Every structure is written in C-alpha cells, then in structure tokens.
Design a protein with these regions (language model features):
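Cap/lid segment of the alpha/beta-hydrolase catalytic domain
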Residues: 386-495, 499-501, 508, 540-542
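Active-site-proximal cap/loop segments of hydrolase catalytic domains
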Residues: 459-659
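Conserved beta-propeller blade repeats
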Residues: 15-30, 66-81, 108, 113-129, ...
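Short loop/turn segments that connect beta-strands within beta-propeller blades
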Residues: 52-55, 102-106, 186-187, 234-238, ...
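Short, solvent-exposed loop/turn segments at conserved positions within beta-propeller repeat blades
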Residues: 40-45, 89-95, 173-178, 222-228, ...
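Hydrophobic or amphipathic alpha-helical targeting/insertion segments
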Residues: 79-142
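Predominantly five- to eight-bladed beta-propeller fold
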Residues: 45-46, 135-183, 228, 279-280, ...
Length: 659
C-alpha cells in the first residue's frame, strides 16, 4: 500500500495550502498566498508568493512576517498591497494594517493603520488610488476619537454592546459596537459617515480612474430583516447615490468594467415558504439613467463569482455545474453563455488579464487548490507552486435514480485495496451547495486512507443542477433530500469495492441535520456522526445568527414537519455529536438538546450507570467548522475511532490529549 500524507494526520496538516490570487493590471505578475503550520502546530501562517505567469519558473516567496500576510491586491503601478499583523515595541497585539510592497523592490511599508484594523482593500486599475474597509465606533467622530474610545473600553475591561437592530452576531463573532466604513487610503478620508449596518458583509469595487466606488449597501426591511442595494459613492465628496434597488431581492457582488463604462452584479430573489430564491446575473451601463437588466435569464445556473474580461467585452463568471465549477463567459448584451473550461475541476479566484488570458485557482477531489493559466484557445497550464499530494485511493462518479426519476450524482472515493470497503455516506452542508471542490476541513481522503469508501452525493437542494432540483427539496428537507441520499447510498452499496453490510452516515451543518434526520428514519447504518447539526428547527430558526433569512422558508408548519427532534424515540444507532461553542450559525443549543434527548428519550438511552453508546465531542473555543490544526486532528481521531468501534467492531482509540 502506498504511503501518503493522508495516512498520517500530522503529515496531512503539514501540506502547504494555497488560497487567493491577484494579477497586476498588465498581466505580468501573479501573486498567491500559501499557508503553513507554525512551529507550535497550533496555527496556520500565510505568506505571499509570486508565481511565474509563463508556468516555467518555481514560485518565489515575497513576505516572511511572523504573523503572516494575506489578501494581496495590485495597484495600478504594480505595487502589491496586503494585510498584515506586525507587532511593535508599543503594541504586541495590533490589529491588521494595510501594507505596500513596491514593485521596484525594497522593504514593505505600512500604508494604513487604524485602531480597529483594516478588513480589505481595493485599488483602482488606472490610478494610484485605494479604498479600504475598516471599522469605527459609532460615537467616534474621527479616527483619533475612535482610538481614544477603544482604549477606554480596553482599560476599563468593557466589552458590553448595546444593540438597536439586527443581526447581533455573525458566524463566530459578535457584531458591534463598531461599524464597517470605507476609507480613501491616500487621502485618509472616511467616505461613509454613520453607515450603521449598511456595510456588514459588503463587497465593493473602485472605478478604474478612482473617482467613485460602487458598494453593496444593506438597508432595513420589515421586522428584523434587511436587504442589499447598490450605491455609488463619489470618492472626492463622499456623496452617496443608490443606483440599484429591488425590494424583492438582494443585489450584491458589484464589479466595475475595466473601462469604467458599466457595472455587473448578482441579484438573489428573496425566497418564500414555497419557492427558493434564484441568483441571476445583472448588468447596467452608467450612462443608462440607472436602468439595469438581468442577463442570461434562461440559463439555469447560479453565478457564484463575477468579473470582467480585461477588454470589458464579456463577463467572466463561475457557477456550480453537475459536480464541477467551470468558468463561463457571458455576453452582457445578448446573454449568450459560453463554457470556457471542460474538466472535473472547480475554479475560483478568477483573474482575467490582457490578451484574453485568465488566471485562477482550481481544485477537485483529485487535487487541492492550485494556480493555473487559461489561454484563449482553451489550454490550461499549471503554474509551479506546491506539489499535489499523492492520493490514497481512487475517485469515481456514480449516478442513482431518485424516487421521482431524477438523476442524483455523487463522487465516491475508494481505498487502494480491491477488498470491499465499509462505506461512509458524507452529506454536504449548505444546504445550497455541492461536493465539487477540494475541502481541507471536510476531506474524504483521510477516511479513505483509513480503509473507508466515502460517498459524497448531491441530493435535492444542491446547486449546479438547475432551479427545479433545488425546488424539489425546498421546505421539505426530510423528504426528497433524504430519499435522494438513500438512493445514492443504494447505488454505492452496489459497487463491487463497497461492503454494503458495514456502513455509516455523517455530515456537518445541513449535513448534520440530515445525519440527525437519518438517525430517526432508518436503522441501516452502524454509526452516525453529526457535526454542528440542526436538531430542533423551531429553536434554530429563532436563535441562528441570520434568523430573518431562514424564517422565509422555515414557517411553523415547515419546522414541525421537518424537525428531527420529533423522531428521537426511533434512534437506535450510536451517534457521535460534535459542536463548537462559538458556532453562531447553528448555535450550541442544538447539540445540547440533542445530547440530552439521546440520553433520555432515544431507543439507546443512558443506562442506570449513565452510560450509552453515544458520544459528545465538545469544543469550547471552536466555531462552526472547528478550524485550528490541533482540534482538526482530534476531530478526525475521534471520528475514525467512533466509526471503527461501531462499523468495524474495533476497540475505540480515544486521543490521549482529551484527558
């Protein structure tokens, strides 16, 4: 058997990880970031690396800060801007600042440092102008007042936040009391006085000449809801004008054409209890008196990222598509869609360059993210960077037929051995998502190296198969998504290299919900792992970080019909519950109630000694995903031990560091 990094968790964590991509306006330089473990193996540290656009020379490291660098952006003159935390004698834990690395050489220098840090930056393509996002406290009239007030809060150990609206937290962090602003970096000027919630989760772009900014701008909606509009902000005066608004949709991801003449963005309609939202591509010319139109309305895919070709002639987008994530070009005038890539990869961080060239990162279940160049003739060239790890098995694709006749496709990993392997059904999160790209956190090859075949299906609600495929499961999570998963499992069990008599199911987030639902509706699996899973839907819909979004689908009737907690008495399969306390998307209360219900009301309750086959892996300081290296390692150790115990009848090997 071939030894690979997936046979050893430490070796797996040692693999360098590529993320992000930036290309200079003239296309002559390409920069990415690579993350590696620190010496204590408790944190990933990211550095900037320059790539050879021709694909011949090895990558060259640009930065070596102890705390790392991220978010590279090129200026019009070819300098590289980036975010970095760099301690000083006066402050050993400063927030992230914006730094500039000159194109002509020399040391990087600090460009913008603010008391609350800098979150992101965008530079104009044709002028030495940069706009950055950074937070300010609402009662601070300027940056200096913000600095004083932050120091007062710190010195007095005050962390209290007085909210007047919603939301109050996001994913794993509290919102407030500071609010995101946009700053003209060169002038040191705040462009967005008193924005309130408007720039939370906002994206923005700067015109090529730097004269204006277009940003997504959140406005209040009835109740606790909000929606996203688009505004144009004059960089000199700060005057803000709403240029696109739709009461029935969120308008997001604005991107200005390289010649400054037009704007592209996405429109996501608000869902209802019966109908899922839909994401479409939109376009407007700045001289058209504010009129904007949807583009390619008959194209049955959701754009996930939008940019422009370097000559501003077409839009370059990515979208999930049948278990892949290709690159497409779209004619903004006719709506004609052309697929530019034809492989099994998913493309991200797409950066068009002059001459019709496109740089991007791509990944699949055969390779982690790696940089590539797409030429106009369709040729794809890998840019030397990090060698892809050897895989511990094979990847195949299978298709099942759902109860209603709909095809349900899946990826299936198989161990090297030709002996039939036990099967793990792994359900993706979202639920609006797809198993179509490499995951460092949810990695099937670690289980495959351990001897398991891993099934990764895209059931109803998955993206990349059209609007009707999503609608099949909308408001009915326990119906078509569940039966699709069972059909996919049946198809995998028919594979000659799968042992159908030894199976388990697992998933995270929505996948955790499905694991909980599966546990109460079938006893076909020997073990079930539920990570950050939804358990009591009526409880979840009121306590999640963005309750107004979920409330559109989760009516009282929907939650009653689809809530897994109603079937706890039918659960006769050992369950491993995993949850992080800092998870605000699926709050810890879901796991706490599930754990109590399993021990008291399931078909496998705790005995008179308080013992049961169920387990609860709790992370006090982790979030929705459990991201730190040391806790990722324990996650896989506990999961494989639990699977081995109940699927293979092997003694559980609990990590010693758990005490």
């Amino acid at each position: 058997m071939t030894s690979t990094p997936f046979h050893d968790l430490d070796a797996f964590l040692d693999i360098p990880r590529i993320s992000g991509l930036a290309v200079s306006p003239d296309g002559s330089r390409v920069v990415t970031t690579i993350s590696t473990l620190n010496s204590k193996r408790t944190e990933f540290v990211t550095a900037l690396w320059e790539l050879d656009p021709a694909g011949r020379q090895p990558a060259r490291r640009l930065t070596r800060g102890l705390k790392g660098e991220s978010a590279p952006v090129f200026t019009a003159g070819g300098d590289v801007l980036f975010l970095a935390v760099r301690p000083t004698d006066d402050d050993d834990k400063p927030p992230a600042a914006l730094w500039r690395l000159p194109a002509l050489g020399g040391e990087a220098h600090e460009m913008l440092a603010l008391p609350g840090g800098v979150s992101s930056a965008v530079s104009a393509r044709g002028a030495d102008i940069t706009v950055a996002a950074a937070p300010l406290l609402p009662s601070a009239g300027d940056v200096e007042a913000d600095r004083v007030l932050r120091k007062q809060r710190k010195d007095n150990k005050v962390s209290a936040i007085l909210h007047t609206g919603y939301p109050v937290r996001r994913w794993d962090h509290d919102l407030g009391p500071d609010q995101p602003h946009l700053f003209d970096v060169e002038a040191g000027r705040d462009l967005t006085a008193a924005p309130g919630i408007a720039l939370q989760e906002s994206t923005f772009d700067v015109s090529p000449d730097g004269s204006f900014v277009v940003a997504s701008w959140r406005v209040p909606a009835p109740g606790a809801a909000s929606r996203s509009t688009l505004v144009r902000i004059d960089r000199t005066t700060g005057t803000r004008t709403t240029i696109a608004d739709d009461p029935l949709a969120d308008l997001e991801l604005p991107v200005i054409a390289p010649d400054g003449s037009a704007l592209a963005f996405t429109r996501e309609t608000h869902s209802t209890a019966d109908t899922p939202g839909r994401i479409t591509l939109c376009f407007m010319r700045f001289h058209s008196c504010g009129e904007w139109v949807e583009v390619a309305t008959d194209w049955d895919r959701w754009p996930s990222a939008v940019t422009w070709a370097a000559d501003a002639s077409t839009l370059i987008i990515t979208a999930d598509d049948n278990g892949r994530g290709p690159v497409f070009s779209v004619d903004p005038d006719t709506g004609a869609v052309t697929r530019l890539t034809d492989d099994d990869h998913t493309y991200t961080d797409v950066c068009p360059a002059p001459g019709g060239i496109i740089y991007a990162l791509r990944s699949s279940y055969t390779a982690p993210p790696h940089p590539v160049r797409l030429d106009p003739d369709g040729t794809v060239t890998e840019l030397p960077c990090v060698d892809a790890p050897t895989l511990p098995g094979d990847l195949t694709e299978i298709t099942a037929t759902a109860e209603d006749g709909t095809p349900v496709r899946s990826w299936l990993t198989l161990p090297e051995s030709t002996d039939p392997a036990p099967l793990v059904l792994w359900v993706h999160g979202g639920p609006l998502g797809s198993w179509n790209s490499w995951h460092w956190r949810w990695n099937p090859w670690l289980l495959t190296a351990h001897g398991y075949a891993v099934l990764m299906p895209d059931p109803a609600l998955s993206t990349g198969y059209g609007q009707q495929f999503i609608a099949r499961g909308w408001g009915a999570w326990g119906e078509a998504p569940y039966t699709d998963l069972m059909a996919a499992t049946d198809a995998a069990c028919a594979h000659p290299r799968v042992d159908a008599s030894r199976t388990a199911a697992m998933g995270g987030s929505f996948g955790g919900y499905m694991a909980n639902w599966i546990a109460g509706h079938t006893d076909r699996f020997d073990a079930i792992v539920t990570h950050a899973g939804l358990w009591e839907l009526d409880q979840f819909r009121h306590t999640t970080d963005g309750a107004y979004w979920w409330a559109r689908e989760m009516t009282p009737e929907m939650t009653q019909r689809n809530s897994p907690h109603r079937f706890v008495d039918r659960i006769s399969t050992p369950m491993l519950v995993i949850h992080g306390d800092k998870d605000y998307r699926v709050p810890i209360g879901e796991a706490l109630r599930l754990w109590y219900d399993l021990l008291t009301d399931s078909a496998l309750p705790a005995d008179d000694n308080g013992e049961s086959p169920h387990r609860f892996l709790y992370y006090p300081a982790e979030n929705h995903w459990v991201l730190t290296p040391q806790h990722t390692k324990i996650w896989y150790q506990v999961v494989t031990a639990f699977l081995d115990e109940h699927v293979r009848s092997q003694p559980a090997q609990v990590p010693g560091l758990l005490g």
